[in-house]
Amino acid sequence: MSLAPHGGTLVNRVDESYDVSGIQKEIELDLISFADLELIGIGAYSPIEGFFNEKDYVSVVENMRLSSGVVWSLPITLPVDAQKAAELSLGETVKLTYEGETYGVIQIEDLYVPDKQKEAVNVYKTDEQEHPGVKKLFSRGNTYVGGPITLIKKASKQFPEFTFEPSETRRQFAEKGWETIVGFQTRNPVHRAHEYIQKTALETVDGLFLNPLVGETKSDDIPADVRMESYQVLLDHYYPKDRVFLGVFLAAMRYAGPREAIFHALVRKNYGCTHFIVGRDHAGVGDYYGTYEAQELFDTFKPEELGITPLKFEHSFFCKKCGNMGTAKTCPHGREHHVILSGTKVRGMLRDGVLPPAEFSRKEVVEVLIKGMKKKEEVGVS
């Protein structure tokens, strides 16, 4: 059986029969809070039951713990602008809308102005506007609304056949007889380095939960539909069907490096994972974080506080002399023999019309990516 959810209980804040006809006020969500609303509602963010009040916000920003003491690394907030904040009052129940449709309600228990400078430095380790997470933070409203939510409608899904709630993945893992499940988070197509890490992990557990993020990402990331097709073709040709489960993760990417790695692990724990792969520069961007800083952050918590086991991997590469994949732990040869693989490199090659070599990526995956990049250019998406 899967481990207990984070905090002990899988949160369920869904009530699709909730009557909002008497509620006049509303808050229009952006893409981040729209995704967060559903993820809170279905229990992916257990034990969180709503957008953070000031007490939880300050505690997480400063100590990576909720005010209850439970480990949580990223603030889950609902920002509004000053004009909207002036309309709201404590104790009110307000509709949460996206593109004019109501998806939930929030019972307002807190309205507060955050110290965004401190949030940026603590969460992202920088206040530079060039950092996509910091840029997004400062572009959002300057008042945060806190309180428990009720999810009354789920968004229509881009990938319905690969969209699962934590209660569903837990049931599926149990039906497969998996007792140990390793989660893998990615926003890139799976290249050979990822494949090597996943299969190495799979040697030690019952199942692999490949859980690509399909929420908001940077504009130069490969589109989600292209990535999903690349995952499917890879799994069909190179993975044992009865040992892998593919499902999407709806959250937006924060690019918060080490803190986001902890967040990714805790969420996968709620989906039923017992282990989580933490590679090099997990959830990083540019040169803001050390190569293995995310792995080191896991070591600052007691294992029972996290309740999910990190599987830490060094950067893997293809060694021409060995003739296969390896890491510094398994390969004795110098860097001149290594083909260093990365999602950034693969993206750059594809953009330049260069075919990545077989050591980089499987042929079937490359074909899907090239087709997808061409389509992206044709429709003029930047």
From Swiss-Prot:
Disulfide linkages recorded for this protein, renumbered to the chain, are: none
Recorded catalytic reaction(s): these are: sulfate + ATP + H(+) = adenosine 5'-phosphosulfate + diphosphate
According to its UniProt entry, the protein's GO biological process terms are: hydrogen sulfide biosynthetic process; sulfate assimilation
Listed InterPro entries? ATP-Sase_PUA-like_dom (IPR025980), PUA-like_sf (IPR015947), Rossmann-like_a/b/a_fold (IPR014729), SO4_adenylyltransferase_pro (IPR020792), Sulfurylase_cat_dom (IPR024951), Sulphate_adenylyltransferase (IPR002650)
Enzyme Commission number? 2.7.7.4
A molecular function annotated in GO for this UniProt entry is: sulfate adenylyltransferase (ATP) activity
- Tell me the keywords, alphabetical order: ATP-binding, Nucleotide-binding, Nucleotidyltransferase, Transferase
Q: Could you tell me what induces this protein?
A: Up-regulated by sulfur starvation and repressed by cysteine. Also induced by O-acetyl-L-serine (OAS), a direct precursor of cysteine, maybe via inactivation of a putative transcriptional repressor of the cysH operon whose activity is controlled by the intracellular levels of OAS.
Q: What class of enzyme is it?
A: transferase
Q: Which domain of life is it from?
A: Bacteria
Q: Describe which pathway this protein belongs to, using the record's wording.
A: Sulfur metabolism; hydrogen sulfide biosynthesis; sulfite from sulfate: step 1/3
Family assignment from sequence similarity: Belongs to the sulfate adenylyltransferase family.
**Protein's UniProt name:** Sulfate adenylyltransferase
- What gene, per UniProt, encodes this protein? sat
